[in-house]
Design a protein with these regions (language model features):
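Positively charged, small/polar-rich N-terminal and surface patches that mediate targeting and assembly
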Residues: 2-138
Length: 138
């Protein structure tokens, strides 16, 4: 039978930190809509920072990257994008407690920005909320 290691104190205790959060939440703020029309990315970056600040105590946005998303509803069309990455550290308890409000924000952003999906990451899990393809005039 293997010996059980004694538990180590967490880094929060080690550094006498006022806050310790070990769950990573990452959002992607798109630069364009599904129809490749630009969106007001700075507005949505600020909305995301505000939402994560209120829900989880803070967040950081990183400059534009380069990305691609395959839109299967449009026959596998590749949509290239320059997303802003927003991340925050929080607790599992806070994520569970604020899940409804976070989902509400993500659906709002995805709808208003005319996205095919809104992707986000919690720790190692990539999650995606999809939106149906809407045709102009229909």
């Amino acid at each position: 039978m293997a010996k059980k290691r004694p538990s180590k104190p967490g880094y929060g205790a080690l550094f006498k930190a006022a806050k310790s959060a070990s769950n990573l939440l990452v959002l992607f703020i798109p630069s364009q809509a599904r129809d490749e029309q630009p969106i007001n990315q700075d507005h949505w970056r600020d909305e995301a920072l505000t939402a994560l600040g209120k829900l989880f105590g803070g967040a950081t946005a990183y400059p534009k990257g380069k990305g691609v998303w395959r839109d299967d509803d449009q026959g596998g069309k590749l949509l290239f994008d320059e997303p802003i990455v927003v991340q925050c550290y929080t607790s599992e308890e806070a994520i569970r407690r604020q899940a409804g409000a976070l989902r509400e924000f993500l659906v709002w952003m995805g709808t208003e920005c005319r996205q095919g999906a809104v992707g986000f990451v919690i720790d190692r899990d990539y999650l995606e909320i999809r939106f149906p393809l809407t045709r102009k005039g229909g």
